[in-house]
């Protein structure tokens, strides 16, 4: 049986976002689990788009070869969909996708 976790980062607090990204990066590099999925949701997308340290962490995670998922509805709401795509995130409607992961 494989071990899986979805790290869902949804805060507007930089420290909370940093911690979620840090865990996803280190956990993936050190193989804490078989599959670590990183999801950016809500206000975290807005702060990541505006913060070079956090966007750099997203790029570092992407360098592991794993995708970063960003919520399309939230990205559109905050006006950062293009920023998320430029960063390299897969911008998608996450509600049904996330539900499938947890089934």
Where are these regions (language model features)?
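Residues at the starts of beta-strands that form the adenosine-phosphate
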Residues: 4, 34-37, 67
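Small/aliphatic-rich secondary-structure junction motif
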Residues: 29-47
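N-terminal glycine-rich FAD/FM-binding segment characteristic of electron-transfer flavoproteins
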Residues: 49-50, 60, 85-86, 90
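Histidine-anchored nucleotide/phosphate-binding helix
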Residues: 17-30
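Short, glycine-rich nucleotide/cofactor-binding loops
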Residues: 5-18, 42-49
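C-terminal structural segments of small proteins and small subunits
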Residues: 81-103
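Structural beta-sheet core signal
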Residues: 7, 38-40, 70
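A glycine-rich helix N-cap at a beta->alpha junction
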Residues: 52-81
């Amino acid at each position: 049986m494989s071990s899986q976790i979805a790290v869902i980062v949804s805060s507007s607090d930089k420290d909370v976002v940093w911690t979620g990204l840090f865990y996803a990066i280190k956990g993936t590099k050190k193989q804490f689990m078989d599959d670590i999925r990183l999801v950016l949701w809500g206000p975290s997308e807005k702060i990541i788009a505006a913060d070079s340290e956090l966007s750099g962490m997203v790029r570092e995670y992407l360098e592991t070869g794993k995708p970063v998922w960003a919520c399309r509805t939230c990205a559109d709401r905050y006006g950062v969909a293009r920023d998320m795509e430029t960063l390299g995130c897969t911008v998608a409607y996450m509600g049904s996708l996330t539900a499938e992961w947890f089934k």
